[in-house]
Amino acid sequence: MTNYIISLLFFCVSVSFLYSLGFTLTKSVSEFSKNFILGFIFYFSTISVFLILIQLFKLPWIFALYSVVTIVIILSVYIIVAFIKNKLCITKKDFISIVKNNYFSIFCVFLLYCIYLLQFDLIWINNHLDDGYYLTKVATLPYLENPYITNYSTGLLNISNGFDSYLLSSYETHASVYRYLLGIDPVVFCRFFMNIFNYFLAVCTVDWFAAELNKRMAYRISKSMIQFCSMVLLIFAFEYTTLARTGLLMVQDSWQFSSAMWYGSSIPRVMGLLWLIVPFINREKIQLKDFVYVTICSFVLIACSSIALPIIVIGGISYLVAFSVTANQKNIRIFTVIILIFVILSGWILPDSPQRSAVIKSFMSQDLKSILFVGSILVTAISVIIFKNRFINRTIITIITCFILMFVPEINDFFEKLSIYDFVYARAQTCFIYTFIIFSFILFIFIFNYLLKNNLKFIIVFSLCLLCSLSILSVIPVYGNPMNIYKIMLNNSYLMPNSTIDLSKQLQSIAEIYNMDLNVLTPEWASVENHRHSLSVMIRTYAPNVNSISAIGRFGVTEGNAFSSYTSDDTGIYNSFCEVQNTQTIDAFKQLLNEYPINCLVFTGDFFNEYSTEFGYTFEKKVDNYYIYVKNNS
């Protein structure tokens, strides 16, 4: 419980700090969401400059801690000075107004997190094993001798001749500093605090977007009603296989919104395009300082995850096209034409990527048949007819241009090459589809506000009840009774199987007792609460002095260490021995242990007892249903 209390207190402090930082930039006390987002962008850009340099030069992790603490102190002093110098203050009336206009934002985060807890299978398999990298990185960075050339899931050195793009992302390093300083359990920190923080970022982004659009509407929504636009995010939290099976929405890695929102990549994938265009939706003229904002924002998005690059480039060009059509600024039009010529020429010169095109066309062909996507198109078309609003049209043109740049042959070749990987290009498509659905839902609210003459209460309540009901119903066919799922999560209150936590801590204890690093073979998968659980990729969460050799099958291994030739076939030898002990499997397993310096074995049963002396291992400890053996004289 202490971990959750500290996390909630830290969440409140973080929101207050970032809002205050944004307030010093805007001088507008009432624009809570805008201040919070701008405060985050300002803060994270400043922090990331130093953290990325530390990573590129592979300096000790302690420099990251010193950098974060120093910058937070400097920014705190800046906030105080700015408040005094500019006579800024938040009165009791201002505070009440902020709460009144944003209380649903917190409630929406609560709903999203409740839905997250229902994604039981994804949590148990650690988000398709990806948590084995990201969560373990946050947990172990402070304790690693080589923090930026380590495979965080295996614990082995990750030596590569090529450039590691992960060094451009400061997100996990930044998170590791606060987790270390606060002493919060790493799993709770990632799956609770970071989840609710990123959900809150998304909610505030939608609120800011809606507020900016609302400024140019003839029939404006009251400030207290704008916050309800964020309920659209509940759609993305539907169980991902249900979304795909029903044809409601097909996008790359849709499961990440409902179960891995805490990932750094979730920020550009969900919010990237909106952060780039929202400040300029209502602009009549673009100035040089606006390019400065876009540059800083782009840097922040890349610092969260390098998948942001195609989102930034496609989104930026698309907005320039939309602005050139809806505004009268000659120099921007010329600049846009030059960029488009460059993109088209590059597309003709660069070779096509048929596989990359096929991936996104497959998703899009499914979405064009979905009720959700077709409904979004209809709502958008109706809004064009009803409102005849130049600034709404600008956003529509921006989104349409994004899809054109992604799908039109030859033109899209430049962006396909820019993405490097298929999944990166597909995630950019996810961002644009999410943005379109968010935009159309806001227009849906605007249309009913116009038709009902500012009497939105019924449609808001109806929409919220419908979305909440559907989000729960989407889970039931996959995971069963929600109450049973909540009971399981309550029994495993650290959001990871208790047995895995106990095993990880015990392995670290053994490593400390024997004063050595453990090279451990464990089952890749285990059954916990009658569900599959990916064990091997997570045992390092509490054990920085343990190397999980069984995780090599998922995360690979590079040259330069004793396990460079180890493959998933070798893990198969271990698995075969676990399944049946006969002359063939015993000899193969003995040969494997002689070939590699594996000094610790974990089995789900005591069948190794009769072979341990022959193999040169001693029984060390039983943890839940796991039996730990350590090599003699190791």
Question: Where do the language-model regions lie?
Answer:
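Membrane-interface alpha helices of multi-pass inner-membrane proteins
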Residues: Q55, D290-I307, I317, V337-L345
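Active-site lumenal/periplasmic loops and adjacent helix-entry segments of GT-C-fold
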Residues: Y113-Y263, I267, M271, P482-M496, ...
